[in-house]
């Protein structure tokens, strides 16, 4: 009897595996069937950046050598990006703490104050920063975040900050809903702290270090790894052959480089700051602290007339700012009508017969987790992958939906990842046929915050090339980019994952993918505009809005 029972269980297991394989094959065939053999020339089919002449800035090559041969257009693009970001930090020499920016002494004032404003009007706010001696600052470079909000309406939007490099800043808001609207301004980091962060970015890229385990038989060794390592010891070169993405490990003493089996985060370097520098990173003093108003901090907004409202409803153009706003806890993009996917059946209907590829860090893994939790028909299969690492796979057999998640290649600060699972996004994209039933979403940013900007630019350049090739061979493929987001900060976290670092990455990402033909989920504005505290992994209500926007790109409203 037990023998028959065992045979029955074995048969059932084999049958289940066979069903999954058949489903994967069937869904994958959809990609081939929907692939159109049209040689479509994209708006920017080369994936190149076109810019006016820019003045290059003097920077030493990362690691002391150039790791990638750039075309003249790529060199121009990189110089333009670096120059634009470099101008934000003035070089004023050493500054004592008492002369650094004090948020409690600084203030803002509403400039164009009026009895009331109409929806769609511009609101201007002047911010004047002072030091701890209550003396006006004479230079800029502080990193400010600003938003307008109405808590009772669960409404919010971000403002655009302009630095006049003299201690004065202007913030521009668009008033997008009626009612009592409050202004909030925060000092994320003083300019003196920003200079420290910039030094760490350029001089201490190894402040997050990685390791790999090498094993052969009973012998095992662990060595340090990174994008760049000192050349005075023998190295294992794991640079990717297709993308040229560099990755090195110190060579084990007894084992060959080919015996590497895992990759994992080694840890964070300590003692990065001097005592004087540490004063610029104090919780409750100068990290994400509010700047108070001098006078009223709110305005009254009244509705527009119907004709005016219709003309305001959707703003056109790639430079629309802000890109959207919250109202009753729902994100409202200003360029298009976003659908609300409040029922699992709505998501199932949208994704039916589709293959969805999610590539990147843990912030897009949240999408996988949300979908598999919210949609009961999406059943996750246990691939034996480490928790929080992946790869992960979920299938809806009834509706032919295949959902995949895979983390991006190193640098990645996850716990143990098998080395054969370290796949670069560009290489994965090159293996996708594409078509109208293929959806790709990418989020690559958080694990690059400690490196010089050239490292991130190179990674995005490789991904962009692969995206352009994918869209050229399959124009109906939907490609979505999830931007960076703000997060909680303390003295230590600021040195590795500061919003200032991520703001730079976000700026680079937007510029490099402008005109390529991808959709953008603006996670940056969606976290800054919301009333909930900033988190690396935003709360569910924010993730839900991100997914609603993502799915609206996949299944837009019919017009």
Curated annotation (Swiss-Prot):
Q: Which residues are glycosylated?
A: 237, 292, 346
| Keywords, sorted A to Z | Glycoprotein, Secreted, Signal
Which positions carry the signal peptide feature in this UniProt record? Answer: 1-30
| Predominant location | secreted
| Any Gene Ontology CC annotation | extracellular region
Q: Which InterPro entries match?
A: Ig_E-set (IPR014756), NXPE4_C (IPR057106), NXPH/NXPE (IPR026845)
* The UniProt record lists the keyword Signal: yes
Q: List the disulfide bonds.
A: none
Pfam families listed in its UniProt record: Neurexophilin, NXPE4_C
Q: Where in the cell is it found?
A: Secreted
User: What family does the Swiss-Prot or TrEMBL record give for this protein?
Assistant: Belongs to the NXPE family.
Protein's name according to its UniProt entry: NXPE family member 3
């Amino acid at each position: 009897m037990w023998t028959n029972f065992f045979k029955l269980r074995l048969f059932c297991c084999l049958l289940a595996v066979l069903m999954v394989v058949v489903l994967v094959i069937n869904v994958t065939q959809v990609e081939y069937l929907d692939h159109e053999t049209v040689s479509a020339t994209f708006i920017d089919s080369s994936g190149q950046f076109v810019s006016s002449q820019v003045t290059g800035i003097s920077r030493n090559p990362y690691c002391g050598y150039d790791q990638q041969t750039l075309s003249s257009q790529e060199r121009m693009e990189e110089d333009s990006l670096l120059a634009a970001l470099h101008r934000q930090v003035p070089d004023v020499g050493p500054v004592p703490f008492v002369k650094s920016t004090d948020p409690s002494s600084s203030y803002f004032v509403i400039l164009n104050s009026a009895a009331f404003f109409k929806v769609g009007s511009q609101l201007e706010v002047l911010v004047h920063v002072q030091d701890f001696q209550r003396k006006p600052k004479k230079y800029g470079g502080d990193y400010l975040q600003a938003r307008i909000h109405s808590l009772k309406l669960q409404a919010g939007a971000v403002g655009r900050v302009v630095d006049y490099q003299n201690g004065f800043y202007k913030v521009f808001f668009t008033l997008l809903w009626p009612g009592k609207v409050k202004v909030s301004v925060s000092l994320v980091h003083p300019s003196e702290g920003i200079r420290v962060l910039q030094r760490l970015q350029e001089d201490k890229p190894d402040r997050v270090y990685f390791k790999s385990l090498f094993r052969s038989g009973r012998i095992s060794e662990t060595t340090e790894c990174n994008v760049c390592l000192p050349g005075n010891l023998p190295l294992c070169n794991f640079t990717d052959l297709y993308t040229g993405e560099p990755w090195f490990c110190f060579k084990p003493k007894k084992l060959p480089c080919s015996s590497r089996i895992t990759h994992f985060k080694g840890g964070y370097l300590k003692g990065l700051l001097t005592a004087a520098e540490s004063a610029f990173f104090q919780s409750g003093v100068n990290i994400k602290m509010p700047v108070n108003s001098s006078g009223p901090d709110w305005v009254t907004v009244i509705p527009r007339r119907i004709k005016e409202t219709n003309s305001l409803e959707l703003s056109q153009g790639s430079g629309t700012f802000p890109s959207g706003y919250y109202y009753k806890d729902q994100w409202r993009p200003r360029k298009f009508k976003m659908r609300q996917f409040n029922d699992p059946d709505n998501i199932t209907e949208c994704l039916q017969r589709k293959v969805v590829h999610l590539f990147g860090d843990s912030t897009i893994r949240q999408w996988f987790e949300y979908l598999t939790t919210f949609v009961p028909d999406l059943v996750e299969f246990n691939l034996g992958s480490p928790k929080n690492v992946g790869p992960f796979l979920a299938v809806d057999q009834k509706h032919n939906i295949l959902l995949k998640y895979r983390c991006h290649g190193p640098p990645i600060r996850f716990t143990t990842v098998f080395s054969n699972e370290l796949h670069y996004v560009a290489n994965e994209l090159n293996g996708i046929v594409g078509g109208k039933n293929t959806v790709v979403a990418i989020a690559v940013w958080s694990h690059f915050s400690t490196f010089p900007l050239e490292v991130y630019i190179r990674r995005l350049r490789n991904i962009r090339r692969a995206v352009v090739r994918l869209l050229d061979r399959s124009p109906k493929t939907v490609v979505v980019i999830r931007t960076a987001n703000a997060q909680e900060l303390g003295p230590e976290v600021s040195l590795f994952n500061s919003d200032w670092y991520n703001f730079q990455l976000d700026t680079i990402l937007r510029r490099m993918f402008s005109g390529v033909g991808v959709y953008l989920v603006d996670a940056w504005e969606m976290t800054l505009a919301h009333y909930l505290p900033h988190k690396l992994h935003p709360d569910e209500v924010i993730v839900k809005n991100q997914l609603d926007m993502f799915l609206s790109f996949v299944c837009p409203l019919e017009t």
